[in-house]
């Protein structure tokens, strides 16, 4: 039986993931409540999302729901268990899913660095121009204004004696 996922959300009390789906054969919209058990404010959201998605009872319903979306729902649930407001949790998710250009990636541990690299890879794939794109131009020439004053950098102004 094939199910088409329409909406996916989270219920905080008692904790559950709620899926509104359409049965392909009948065409009726239905709601499935998947309780979240043994989840605390210290739980790993990625692991919990994978377990729910691979659960044999819910697997056929969650085929079309991306794992990232389930992870995000579990982050909302964990934030609620930690006592954070919805706005605070959304701000935390925004900080974790965006790259700060001023952040020193050398100071991050391996797990955080891998997360940042995966975010960069996703952004690269999303913004990459391919040959078959309608807006693709092979040889782009860019004119830079010559009348503006050039900004110097500290390594540009270093003396030659330092070398």
From Swiss-Prot:
Assembly behavior: Interacts with CEP43; this interaction is required for its localization to the mother centriole. Interacts (via residues 121-150) with RABL2B. Interacts (via C-terminus) with CEP350; this interaction is required for its localization to the mother centriole.
Gene Ontology cellular-component annotations: centriole; centrosome; ciliary basal body; cytosol; nucleoplasm; spindle pole
Pfam families reported for this sequence: CEP19
Family to which this protein belongs: Belongs to the CEP19 family.
InterPro entries: CEP19 (IPR029412)
Disruption phenotype: Severe obesity, hyperphagia, decreased energy expenditure, impaired whole-body fat oxidation, altered hepatic insulin signaling, and impaired glucose and insulin tolerance. Spermatogenic cells and seminiferous tubules show marked degeneration.
Free-text function comment from the UniProt entry: Required for ciliation. Recruits the RABL2B GTPase to the ciliary base to initiate ciliation. After specifically capturing the activated GTP-bound RABL2B, the CEP19-RABL2B complex binds intraflagellar transport (IFT) complex B from the large pool pre-docked at the base of the cilium and thus triggers its entry into the cilia. Involved in the early steps in cilia formation by recruiting the ciliary vesicles (CVs) to the distal end of the mother centriole where they fuse to initiate cilium assembly. Involved in microtubule (MT) anchoring at centrosomes.
Keyword Cytoplasm: yes
Disulfide-bond pairs as recorded: none
PANTHER family: CENTROSOMAL PROTEIN OF 19 KDA, CENTROSOMAL PROTEIN OF 19K CEP19
Transmembrane intervals: none
Highest rank taxon of the organism: Eukaryota
Protein name: Centrosomal protein of 19 kDa
Compartment(s) where it occurs, according to its Swiss-Prot or TrEMBL record: Cytoplasm, Cytoskeleton, Microtubule organizing center, Centrosome, Centriole; Cytoplasm, Cytoskeleton, Spindle pole; Cytoplasm, Cytoskeleton, Cilium basal body
A GO biological-process term: cilium assembly
Keywords per UniProt: Cell projection, Cilium, Cilium biogenesis/degradation, Cytoplasm, Cytoskeleton, Obesity
């Amino acid at each position: 039986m094939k199910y088409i996922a329409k909406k996916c959300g989270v219920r905080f009390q008692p904790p559950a993931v709620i899926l509104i789906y359409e049965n392909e054969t009948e065409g009726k919209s239905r709601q499935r409540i998947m309780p979240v058990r043994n989840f605390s404010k210290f739980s790993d959201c990625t692991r919990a999302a994978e377990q729910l998605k691979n659960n044999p009872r819910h697997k056929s319903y969650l085929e079309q729901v991306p794992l990232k979306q389930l992870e995000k729902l579990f982050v909302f649930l964990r934030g609620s268990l930690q006592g954070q407001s919805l706005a605070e949790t959304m701000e935390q998710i925004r900080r974790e899913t965006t790259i700060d250009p001023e952040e020193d990636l050398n100071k991050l541990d391996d797990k955080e660095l891998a997360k940042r690299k995966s975010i960069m890879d996703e952004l690269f794939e999303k913004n990459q121009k391919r040959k078959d794109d309608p807006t693709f131009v092979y040889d782009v020439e860019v004119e830079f204004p010559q009348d503006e004053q050039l900004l110097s950098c500290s390594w540009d102004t270093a003396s030659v004696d330092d070398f």
